[in-house]
Each structure stands twice: as C-alpha cells, then as structure tokens.
C-alpha cells in the first residue's frame, strides 16, 4: 500500500535551435542547442490502480516500455491532463517519455536518474536537448555523440534573461518529419562541411554563450539566426526550404522586419520561433501579425523561457 495519493509531473516543451556538427567531422556527431519554454507543457498524474488505466496511447507505450525494463507492475492509472502538441518541433515525444518515466520512478521509488530513464525510453539518440531541459530548464548545450555515448552530455547551461520573450509561430495544418521519415531524411542528407562545423562551434562558444551571460539579446539573436540559416539550408532538400512551412517563412520575414531576432525553426518544424525584448513589445507585434496573417492557418503565441526543469511532486 502506497503512503501517498498520487504523483504529479510537469515536463516543459523545448525549442531545438540547431545542430553543430551533423556529420561528425570534428570527432563527435550532432551537438545541439536549445531552450526550455514556459508553455506548452506535458502534465500528468499517476495513481495506484487494480489494472492498467491509460487513455493516452503515447503515455501507455511509455508505461509498458518502462515497466518491462524495470520489472514493475503496469497496474497504475495515468491521467494526461495536458500534452505538448505532437510533431510540431516542441519535443512532445521526449517530454512524454520523461514525464511518464520520472513519475513511475517516483511511484516505485527506483532511484533512477533522468538519463537512466531517457536511455530506457530510447530518447536522446541524436540530441540531448530534451533531456537537458527536463533536468535543468533554461538554455542548454549538449556535446553530441562520441563512440561510447549513451545520451549526449550537457556541456553548458544558462538561465535566459527574464525580459526575453519568444514568439512561436505554429502552422496548424502541418507536422514536421518524424519517425521513419525523419530517420531516412538524416541518412539522405549530404555531408556537413567541417569548416561550417568549426564556424558554428566558434559562434556558439565565443558569441552566443557570452551574449546570454551579458544579457545581449541582439548579439545572441544574430548568432542563432546565422546558425539556423546554415543548418536550415543543409536540411532544405528534406523539408523544402529553410522553413518547412511557407506560411511560417512569410511570418518570420514579417517578424524580422519588425524587430524580432533569433529567427529560426525548431527541429523539423513546422513551428518557427524568434526573440524580442519585453512582454508588451512582443504582444503588440503578435497582434499585428495576427491581423496580417488572419487568412492563414498560423497561430502566434508569446512565451517566456522556463529556467527550471521538469517537476515531480509526491502528493500525500
């Protein structure tokens, strides 16, 4: 008999802001940067039950995988209260897996780390950003994959300045590449030039990270835009351009000309993102964008960074 009533878990969405070395020319494959968002989130509650009760298919799949690996019972109820939208570039799969795994870890008192859980759920195979934001939140950098890497190590973590605001541009009619399509797309990409991997690594280390530390939004934005342009052009044969959605591309152009910085697409999209200083400025710009793009399937949302990781709460 458990001594608690339930386990509550919150897992944050994330922006995947790009890779550093897609071909491993510098000795390690991938290497990623990204940031945790205040919303959307995946939120679920786990309670004891006499049988398996899960209405969310993705959560059920994660439950079965976890319980088979650690030889614990699937007789629990998982209520998914909120879920990050699937296949739009916000990390829904990893965050659901980590939310279910972290909740069950607490429920059964297994003492597992977030990385143990991620490896069990086959997360972090290319990027460690989803793991990093669940662990710490904020802006994170992972070191990619070496010969013996299980999950990419976290190399850097910074809190995002409180006044920075992200504008998300979501195309409600489309999804980014995922599953087998994503795997095949990576296989079909041409080699990523070593000189570009060196340049992007330099820009991150000597420009983007100092810019966050010094609250220099303009400089940070320049680097992210350049990194996104470079990686987006490399991915363009697989996704039809730097942006997956032509409507998102048009909206990002409008936002750029009206003062937004750090222009990019998260993961395979179709969601675009940018940064701007201050709530009021961001909301005004979004209101203009909503009018201009009213006849498109676009949705605009202002969010802040989440400078803390996922939450696991034992309720008594």
Predicted feature descriptions by range:
Residues 270:
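Conserved glycine-rich beta-strand-loop-beta hairpin in the small C-terminal domain of fold type I
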Residues 1-90, 105-114, 125, 307-309, ...:
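ATP-binding N-lobe of GHMP and related small-molecule kinases
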Residues 77-79, 273, 301:
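A structural signal for isolated positions on well-ordered beta-strands in alpha/beta enzyme cores
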Residues 57-60, 98, 202, 283:
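Short, well-ordered alpha-helical segments
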Residues 90-114, 133-144:
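DPxDG-like acidic metal-binding loop motif
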Residues 1-10, 16-18, 24-29, 113-261, ...:
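ATP-dependent small-molecule kinase catalytic core of the GHMP/sugar-kinase superfamily
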């Amino acid at each position: 008999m458990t001594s608690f009533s339930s386990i509550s878990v919150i897992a944050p969405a994330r922006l995947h802001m790009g890779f550093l070395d897609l071909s491993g020319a510098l000795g390690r494959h991938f290497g990623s940067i990204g940031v945790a968002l205040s919303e959307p989130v995946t939120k679920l509650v786990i309670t004891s039950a006499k049988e398996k009760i899960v209405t969310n298919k993705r959560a059920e799949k994660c439950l079965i995988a976890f319980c088979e690996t650690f030889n614990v019972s699937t007789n629990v109820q998982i209520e998914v209260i909120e879920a990050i939208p699937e296949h739009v570039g916000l990390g829904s799969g990893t965050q659901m897996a980590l939310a279910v795994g972290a909740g069950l870890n607490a429920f059964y008192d297994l003492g597992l780390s977030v990385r143990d859980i991620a490896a069990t759920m086959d997360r972090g195979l290319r990027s460690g950003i989803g793991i990093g934001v669940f662990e710490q939140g904020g802006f994170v950098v992972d070191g990619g994959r070496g010969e013996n890497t299980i999950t990419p190590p976290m190399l850097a973590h910074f809190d995002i300045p409180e006044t920075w605001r992200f504008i998300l541009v979501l195309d409600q009619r489309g999804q980014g590449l995922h599953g087998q399509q994503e795997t095949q797309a990576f296989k079909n990409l041409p080699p990523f030039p070593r000189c570009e991997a060196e340049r992007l690594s330099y820009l991150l280390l000597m420009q983007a990270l100092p810019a966050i530390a010094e609250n220099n939004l303009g400089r940070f934005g320049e680097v992210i835009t350049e990194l996104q342009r470079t990686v987006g052009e490399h991915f363009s044969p697989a996704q039809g351009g730097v942006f997956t959605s032509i409507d998102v591309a048009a909206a990002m152009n409008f936002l750029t000309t009206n003062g937004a910085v750090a222009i990019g697409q998260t993961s395979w999209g179709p969601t675009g993102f940018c940064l701007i200083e201050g709530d009021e400025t961001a909301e005004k710009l979004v209101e203009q964008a909503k009018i201009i793009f009213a006849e498109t399937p676009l949705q605009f949302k202002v969010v802040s960074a989440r400078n803390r990781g996922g939450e696991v709460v034992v309720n008594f």
